[in-house]
Every structure is written in structure tokens, then in C-alpha cells.
């Protein structure tokens, strides 16, 4: 049996997945025959078998090209959508299989819990000597915060996501072994209905989504998925603690959520003070509506009568206070529920919540007041035989209120440093501001940042826009409370002057508390290789600045620093990016500790490996010792949100994995590795030589022209994926101005995935030539950072295809001969050293499940990619004016994105 066929063997636990894939694949065939024709299905089968044969022989895709080229746009679009539909059902089957495997573990009753879950984490901690008292001391320090962003990487529209949820629900229902044949037939019919409706729904919206659309999109996951699973996460942790330690603990809040949607102004002119205010208002309405609905449902449970059961004196006293506070509501409720104190209090709590929603008299001043009421009910139920008469449901609502407050998710605001600099330069009348020394600028800013002097008001658009933003934040703090606001992030932060600038602008905008301090956490984002290298110096300067240090004392002597995975990779290649991020964390921690400041890292990770994606558990295991310390703040972008939080069971699993990983990394961090001192210079060399190779490639003359011809970047720029443009407004098409997301997306579509591996082979080869091969092998075996790095490169390489990348490259004409041989040679070098150092004959040999997932899809991705090359050539011949060809190309982009399971 050849390598390709043997790679498609399913392990015993995955046989149900194989059966689902076959069954759903047959269902797709039935769909195509019904919706198009039997001849169309036969053609799809012919193309599919040709693609598989091509994979088995590892030959150029000439046979595929001859089958696919020259098709009419609508016929091409139908073909692409047929293969995309297969990816859709395979992706769904795999997600449902994860739920199946989770249930298998839970049912097994063995002493081996599911890896990376909370039970697994606690058992490992106990085995390492962590006591219940130590766990109790640490839990209040745990703070896990996924932050949802609206980066344009979600290539599947909302209408299709909702239908996917219906398909998932029907498959999950079918997991029930007690289903009757009729019920299983109904499940299949529900799946077929949603699948057919998906086929009849256009893959992409004809208009670019607005900020409001993006807000609704993220709000869907927060209110429809995470809202429901948050209490279950805490219940799972309670059960795991009791099972592991034989005792229970009162759990503090461990999780909260953040969002950039409506607050990320960086390069997006559609985000401003109005979207900030509108987002906070919309989120408040959304979460209060959920509380109102849940209280309404609780009323049916809390029907206890005073003639049969008592209530606590504290609850009775609160009831009296509320009847005086809300006499009209009490008068309406008392005749019906006068003998039902819980229900009467519930009615009055709903009246207070409605007043909160309407900004009326009697409103709750803060979520803590609602929490207090719910706790009163819990305490009363507990002492009056009500543990099994509503206590459980009330506590679930309490966990939700603790997690979501009255704001749903904390809103971050982000803007680029140059925007602030231009505003201050105009305010101070200094046209040469950017050319002045950063230390000199910081000195000039000191009096304005401290409030000693007022930064002059200037009547221009840039200053007015920023003033409005800070005024909106001040108003939001009053209206929604401090918990509704996250951080103010400065992208492309280079020095302390960039941070002091924001402090001065915030004061001018009126964001000042009663004590005269600026109540804002200002976060520099280091996102280029050079800024990561210089980040320690910047933070040292910042923490030594008396004005900023005074500000920081008012913020609890805690400083957050955001690390950018995307632009650092685009700037210097993935090896320099990963190593720069690792070193920056170590050096920043040391610098902050010396100055008595607690540092928190905010990880700006994207969906793809290139942009810091991958499993959080492995990332934390590979992180520097002490860098977690109980806190994890990380962005969740684009297709990652759907993949991790689109299904309730998988959302719960994601939250458990993050929380468990933080507990492990914090309570029992990895022991120091003495050999790391010897390994760091080796990694320095790998990163340095990798950067030389990478920059030599992307910085070569005519490279950007080659990039624009050898990838479908021009199609991606025409797609309506998000509210933010693909490059910063008013700037040319240079690589430095192109955003990291479309940069990665374009190369992923071209199947070369250059940003995910280029230069790595050269870096490793240089280290070997310098006599470090034995060290590299030790690093791959014993250093989690390096092992994770190599594993990630292996995964990226597995998703690429050199033969198809060559088809794209030939679209560049004469430039193909200049650039593609370099790609081919560097790829061969990288594959060689990755496999050699990992001790593997083939990529992903250590992860057969992932290898199977990729190989299952590749024969179906290949026809779309080959067709994309043909369509791209024809579309460009029309100067990009043929809308039918463009629509077919957009379908190709969506299809490949579904197949490789990431975009940017």
C-alpha cells in the first residue's frame, strides 16, 4: 500500500469518524445530483479520482488542469462549491467526533481523564505535590480572558454558520444510543435540510460587513454559546477538585471576556467614538436581556409558599426594601405572588433590571447588587431545604452575572502610535516631531501627561477624533462602570514617548477621575522584530519615568504589554518572530521585577500558525518560566472563534483547556533547564540566519510584483471579509504597509505558505554548519519551546503543496524563474532539517490524527486550487473587470479556506 493510502487508516477510536465522513460524503453526492444533475455528480467523481491519483503518484497537476481549465464562470463556481460542501461536512464531522471522544472519556470511568481537561490538570498538580490549601490560595489569582477581534479572517458568512450549527445539532442528537430508527431518520432529515439550505445560500455577502455586523457576529458567540457554558465550566472544576482532593472549594471568578469589535481603530476609519459608545450600549442591552429572560424562567421554579417552607430573614428584609423602592412593581406582583417570597423577589429583581436597561429610577447601580440578590436566594434556599428546589438554576445565573457583569465583554480600544504622534505634533505646533529624539519628546510630553499643563486644543480632524474617543471612554466609565472598559492598546509602539502621548491625550479628552489620575490601562504593542528586541528598553524607560510611574501606582503597579505575533512574522520571518517573542518575555519579566511592577502579557495571536495560532496548551507549556503567573489574555480571531466557540461542547472544552493550562503553568511551572543557557546562542544563530534568508527573499527587487502575481491577493482585496481595509489607508502596496492577515491569507491560498516556514531551513543549516547539530537534536527532544516550534513548522509544511504553488508562481511570467527556484530549494532544506531533528520519516508522523485530517482534505482542495489558477489568469486578462469570474474566484478562496481550515 502506498504512503498516501496508508495514511488514511483510521485508528480504532476514530472509526466512527470514518463512518460519519462516508455517510455524509454520500449525502453530499445525493445533494449534488438533486440540486444540479446526475451528470454533474459523475463529473465531480471523475475530478476527485484524478486528484487522488495525482496525490498517490506525487506528480504535477497537469491532468487536473486539463480537466478543469476553460470552464464557464458559473460552472466553475458550482464545481468549487461542490468540493467546498464536502469540506463543510468533514469539518462538522470532526467537530462532532471531538464531542464523541469527550463523552467516551466521561463515560469510561477509568483513572485516565481526557488529556488537557480540568480533571487531568488537577491530577497532575496533585501528583506534583500541590495541596488543596495551595490551590485555594492560587485560584483568586487566576484570570483567563479570551479577547474576540474582528480581523477579516472569517471567510464564512453568518447565515452559513447558523446552518452549520443546525447540522451539528442533528449529529450530536444522533450520538444518543437510545435514539429510535424514526428519530434517527428525523436527525438525517434535519441535517439534509440545513445542508440543502446552505447549498442554496451564497458563500459570501455582496457588501462588506459594517462594524455593527461584526459586533453582532461576535455577540452571537458570547450570548448564544459562552453565556450557556460558563456555569458548566465552574461546575466541572468543582467536580474535578472534589474528585481529586476529596473536598470542595468556593470558586472565585476565573474567566471573563474581552472584545475589540467597535474599538479597534487601527487602520479602520469606520471605528470611532460612536462605535465605541454604540458597542457598549449594545452589549449592555444584550446581556441584560439574557438576565431578564433567565429570571423569568427561574420564576416558574421558585414557587415556594410561606405556608410550606420558610425563607431567610435577610431575604425577607431585602423584600421589604424592594417593596418600598419599587411600590408600583410590588403592587402588581403582590396580589399574585404574595405568599411566594422567592417569586415576589424575582418579580422585583426583574423590575430593577428593566429599570437598569431603561436608565430609570430603581436601577441596579452595579452588577454586585444583582449578585447580592442572587446570593440571598441561594443562602435562603440552602438553609430551607431548597438545594433541590431551584438552588442549582439560581447559582448558574450567579456565575453568569459574575462572568459577564452588565457589559458582556470588556471593550479594548486600539490605535496606531503615528496617529497619536500626528495629533500631538499639531497640538504643539512642531512639524518636525517625528524626527526629534524619542527621549527629548518624552521630556516635552511630561507636563502634559502629568496634568501639570493642559495639552492645547487644536481644531483639526485628527485631534477632534481622538478627543471624542477619550470623551466617549470617560462617559462609558460613568455609564457602564470601569469593568466595561479594557485596555487602550498602542499598535506599532516604539518608545516611552508613544505611551506618554496617549496619557496626555487622555487628559485633554477628559478621561480623569476624582483623584486626578487617568483611569486607563495603557498597553504598548510590540509587533516588529526590532520593537520586540527594543521592548525591554522601552519598558525600562517607561517604568523609570516619574510621570508614568505615578500613573502606574494608581493602576496597582501592574503593567500589561501586548506581543504581536503577526507583524513580527511578516517583518523577519517565523523563526525570528518566535524567538524574539520568547526572549522578549524573559527580558521584560526581569526588567519589571527589578522595578517592582507586575507584568501581564497580552498575546496577539491569529488563526494560523504563522500568526501565533495553534493549541493554547502547547503554547503555555513552551512559554518562558514565570510568564503566565495566573494570567492569560489572548486574542481569538476570525475562523478561530468559530472553530473553538461555535459549538457549546467545544466552547466548554476550549475554556477548560485554557484554564487547566494556566493552572499547570502557574502552580507548577516547568523546572529550569540548565542547558537552556547553552541553547540560547544556538537559537540566536538560527533566528539571525533565518531572518537573513527571509528578508533576502521578500526584500529582493520586484518581489512585491511577484507576490501580487503569484498569489490571489488581488482577489482577497476585493472580497468583503471585514470592515477594515487590507492595508493602512493612504499608503502604498509595499510589504511593510500590507497587513499581516492578507499577507498570510494570500500565501495560504497559493499553497506555498511562505510566511510559515521560509528561512527556517537556512537558519537550521547554518547552526549545523557551525557545529551545533547535536545541540539542535537535544533542543528538539528536551526544550518545549523548540519542539513546539518544529512541530508547528511541520504542520504548515504539511498543508502546502509545491506542485500547485508552482502553478500559481507561473502566473508571474518571467519573475517565476527568479523566485520559484528559491522557494523550492528553501522548502527542501526546511523539510529535511525539520524531519531530521524530529526523528521522523514523514511530516506529522508523531501526530497521525492531524496528518489524517490534512490528507483527508488534500485531494479535494487540489481541484479548487488548480481551477483558481485558471480563473485567476483569465480574470486578470480582463483587468479585473469580469464580475462573474471574480465571483467564481471568491468561491475558490472560500473553498480553500474551508479545506485548509485557516485563512489569515
From Swiss-Prot:
Keywords: Carbon dioxide fixation, Lyase, Magnesium. It catalyses: oxaloacetate + phosphate = phosphoenolpyruvate + hydrogencarbonate. SUPFAM superfamilies: Phosphoenolpyruvate/pyruvate domain. Its EC number is 4.1.1.31. It is an enzyme of class 4 (lyase). GO terms for molecular function: magnesium ion binding; phosphoenolpyruvate carboxylase activity. The active site is at residues 151, 570. One of its GO terms (biological process) is carbon fixation. One of its GO terms (cellular component) is cytosol. Forms oxaloacetate, a four-carbon dicarboxylic acid source for the tricarboxylic acid cycle. PANTHER family: PHOSPHOENOLPYRUVATE CARBOXYLASE. This is Phosphoenolpyruvate carboxylase.
Amino acid at each position: 500500500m502506498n504512503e498516501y493510502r496508508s495514511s488514511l487508516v483510521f485508528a480504532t477510536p476514530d472509526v466512527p469518524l470514518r463512518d460519519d465522513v462516508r455517510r455524509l460524503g454520500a449525502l453530499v453526492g445525493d445533494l449534488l445530483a438533486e440540486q444540479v444533475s446526475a451528470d454533474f455528480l459523475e463529473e465531480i467523481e471523475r475530478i476527485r479520482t484524478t486528484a487522488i491519483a495525482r496525490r498517490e503518484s506525487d506528480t504535477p497537476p497537469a491532468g487536473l488542469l486539463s480537466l478543469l481549465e476553460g470552464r464557464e464562470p458559473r460552472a466553475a463556481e458550482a464545481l468549487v462549491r461542490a468540493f467546498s460542501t464536502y469540506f463543510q461536512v468533514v469539518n462538522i464531522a470532526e467537530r462532532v467526533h471531538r464531542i464523541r471522544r469527550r463523552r467516551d472519556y466521561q463515560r469510561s470511568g477509568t483513572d485516565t481523564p481526557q488529556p488537557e481537561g480540568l480533571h487531568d490538570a488537577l491530577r497532575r498538580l496533585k501528583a506534583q505535590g500541590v495541596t488543596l490549601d495551595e490551590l485555594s490560595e492560587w485560584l483568586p489569582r487566576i484570570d483567563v480572558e479570551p479577547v474576540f477581534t474582528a480581523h477579516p479572517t472569517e471567510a464564512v458568512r453568518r447565515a452559513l454558520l447558523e446552518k452549520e450549527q443546525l447540522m451539528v445539532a442533528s449529529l450530536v442528537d444522533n450520538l444518543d444510543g437510545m435514539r429510535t430508527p424514526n428519530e434517527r431518520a428525523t436527525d438525517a432529515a434535519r441535517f439534509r435540510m440545513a445542508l440543502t439550505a446552505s447549498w442554496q445560500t451564497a458563500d459570501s455577502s455582496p457588501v462588506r460587513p459594517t462594524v455593527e455586523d461584526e459586533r453582532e457576529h461576535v455577540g452571537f458567540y458570547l450570548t448564544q454559546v459562552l453565556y450557556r457554558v460558563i456555569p458548566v465550566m465552574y461546575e466541572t472544576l468543582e467536580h474535578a477538585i472534589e474528585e481529586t482532593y476529596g473536598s470542595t472549594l468556593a470558586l472565585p471568578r476565573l474567566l471573563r471576556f474581552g472584545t475589540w469589535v467597535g474599538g479597534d481603530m487601527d487602520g479602520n476609519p469606520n471605528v470611532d467614538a460612536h462605535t465605541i459608545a454604540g458597542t457598549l450600549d449594545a452589549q449592555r442591552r444584550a446581556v441584560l436581556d439574557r438576565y431578564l429572560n433567565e429570571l423569568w424562567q427561574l420564576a416558574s421554579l421558585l414557587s415556594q409558599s410561606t405556608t410550606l417552607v420558610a425563607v431567610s430573614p435577610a431575604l425577607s428584609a431585602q423584600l421589604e426594601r424592594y417593596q418600598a423602592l419599587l411600590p408600583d412593581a410590588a403592587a402588581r406582583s403582590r396580589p399574585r405572588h404574595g405568599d411566594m417570597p422567592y417569586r415576589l423577589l424575582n418579580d422585583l429583581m426583574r423590575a430593577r433590571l428593566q429599570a437598569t436597561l431603561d436608565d430609570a429610577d430603581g436601577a441596579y447601580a452595579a452588577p454586585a447588587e444583582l449578585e447580592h440578590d442572587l446570593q440571598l436566594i441561594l443562602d435562603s434556599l440552602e438553609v430551607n431545604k431548597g438545594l433541590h428546589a431551584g438552588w442549582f438554576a439560581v447559582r448558574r445565573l450567579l456565575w453568569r452575572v459574575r462572568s459577564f457583569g452588565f457589559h458582556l465583554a470588556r471593550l479594548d480600544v486600539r490605535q496606531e502610535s503615528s496617529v497619536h504622534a500626528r495629533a500631538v505634533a499639531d497640538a504643539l505646533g512642531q512639524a518636525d516631531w517625528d524626527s526629534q529624539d524619542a527621549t527629548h519628546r518624552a521630556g516635552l510630553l511630561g507636563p502634559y501627561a502629568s496634568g501639570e499643563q493642559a495639552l492645547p486644543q487644536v481644531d483639526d480632524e485628527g485631534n477632534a477624533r481622538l478627543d471624542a474617543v477619550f470623551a466617549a471612554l470617560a462617559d462609558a466609565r460613568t455609564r457602564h462602570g470601569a469593568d466595561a472598559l479594557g485596555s487602550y492598546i498602542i499598535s506599532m509602539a516604539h518608545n516611552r514617548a508613544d505611551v506618554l502621548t496617549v496619557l496626555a491625550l487622555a487628559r485633554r479628552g477628559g478621561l480623569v477621575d476624582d483623584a486626578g489620575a487617568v483611569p486607563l490601562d495603557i498597553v504598548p504593542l510590540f509587533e516588529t522584530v526590532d520593537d520586540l528586541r527594543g521592548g525591554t528598553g522601552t519598558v525600562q524607560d517607561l517604568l523609570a519615568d516619574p510621570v508614568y510611574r505615578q500613573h502606574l501606582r494608581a493602576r496597582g503597579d501592574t503593567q500589561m504589554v501586548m506581543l504581536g505575533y503577526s507583524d513580527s512574522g511578516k517583518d523577519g520571518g517565523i523563526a525570528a518572530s518566535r524567538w524574539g517573542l520568547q526572549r522578549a518575555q524573559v527580558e521584560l519579566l526581569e526588567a519589571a521585577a527589578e522595578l517592582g511592577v507586575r507584568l501581564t502579557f497580552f498575546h496577539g495571536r491569529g488563526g494560523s500558525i504563522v500568526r501565533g495560532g495553534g493549541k493554547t496548551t502547547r503554547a503555555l507549556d513552551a512559554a518562558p518560566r514565570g510568564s503566565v503567573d495566573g494570567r492569560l489574555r489572548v486574542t481569538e480571531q476570525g475562523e478561530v472563534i468559530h472553530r473553538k466557540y461555535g459549538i457549546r461542547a467545544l466552547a466548554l472544552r476550549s475554556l477548560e483547556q485554557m484554564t487547566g493550562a494556566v493552572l499547570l503553568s502557574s502552580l507548577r511551572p516547568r523546572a529550569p533547564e540548565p542547558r537552556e543557557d547553552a541553547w540560547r546562542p544556538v537559537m540566536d544563530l538560527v533566528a539571525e540566519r533565518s531572518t537573513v534568508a527571509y528578508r533576502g527573499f521578500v526584500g529582493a527587487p520586484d518581489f512585491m510584483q511577484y507576490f501580487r502575481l503569484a498569489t490571489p491577493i488581488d482577489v482577497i482585496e476585493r472580497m468583503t471579509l471585514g470592515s477594515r481595509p487590507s492595508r493602512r489607508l493612504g499608503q502604498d502596496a509595499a510589504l511593510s504597509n500590507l497587513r499581516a492577515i492578507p499577507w498570510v491569507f494570500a500565501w495560504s491560498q497559493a499553497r506555498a505558505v511562505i510566511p510559515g516556514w521560509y528561512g527556517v531551513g537556512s537558519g537550521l543549516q547554518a547552526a549545523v554548519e557551525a557545529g551545533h547539530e547535536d545541540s539542535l537534536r537535544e533542543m528538539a527532544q528536551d526544550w518545549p519551546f523548540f519542539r513546539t516550534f518544529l512541530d508547528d513548522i511541520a504542520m504548515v509544511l504539511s498543508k502546502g503543496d509545491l506542485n500547485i504553488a508552482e502553478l500559481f508562481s507561473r502566473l508571474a511570467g518571467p519573475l517565476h524563474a527568479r523566485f520559484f527556484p528559491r522557494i523550492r530549494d528553501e522548502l527542501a532544506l526546511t523539510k529535511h532539517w525539520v524531519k531530521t531533528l524530529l526523528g521522523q520519516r514523514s511530516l506529522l508522523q508523531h501526530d497521525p490524527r492531524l496528518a489524517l485530517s490534512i490528507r483527508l482534505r488534500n485531494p479535494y482542495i487540489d481541484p479548487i486550487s488548480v481551477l483558481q489558477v485558471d480563473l485567476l489568469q483569465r480574470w486578470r486578462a480582463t483587468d479585473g473587470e469580469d464580475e462573474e469570474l471574480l465571483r467564481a474566484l471568491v468561491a475558490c478562496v472560500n473553498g480553500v479556506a474551508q479545506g485548509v481550515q485557516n485563512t489569515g
